[in-house]
Amino acid sequence: MIRKANINDAKDIVKVNVMGWKNTYKNVFPQTFLDELDPEDENSIRKCQEKINQYAVCEIDNKIVAMIRYGRNKKSYDDSYAEIYALYVDDSYKKQGIGSKLVEFAFEELRKEYDYVLISTLVDNSANEFYKKIGGKFVGNCDFLLGNDKFVENMYEYLLK
């Protein structure tokens, strides 16, 4: 079931997010950085609770198996643009349409206030094919900084209205 997240979901959202990072970015980001990511980190859980209105989740058998975070675009001053900040699906539940359903849920929410959505993902991320498949138009690259390391992301644009 896809639904808006509530404050009680924060711990599970952080867990899905951290496991998503560890699985997706293995051999991409420094392993020491990934090893430090803690799914039980109280600070991360608190931050998630503070922004819980930006999250939706997929719950199956009372377990959060996927999450999406969305809101105003942080990369642009154009108020007509929203952004998908994060989308992670537990590896055991991938290739079942959950990611597509979460994106569509977020688009419906964002359509109320915005005309466009941007999604950025690392150029080497296998998710690039997914974002193209669901209608993303490649609009350029942007830099992503992680500590002192710079990575390049592809940006995809979606028309909401």
Question: Could you describe each region identified by the protein language model?
Answer:
Residues 4-10, 15-28, 32-91, 103-105, ...:
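Acetyl-CoA-dependent GNAT
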Residues 93-96:
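Glycine-rich phosphate-binding loop
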Residues 100, 124-140:
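Conserved active-site alpha-helix within GNAT-family acetyltransferase domains
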Residues 110-122:
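Conserved GNAT acetyl-CoA-binding A-motif
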Residues 143-149:
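Short proline/glycine-enriched turn/loop segments at secondary-structure junctions
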Residues 150-161:
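Terminal substrate-recognition subdomain of acyl/acetyltransferases
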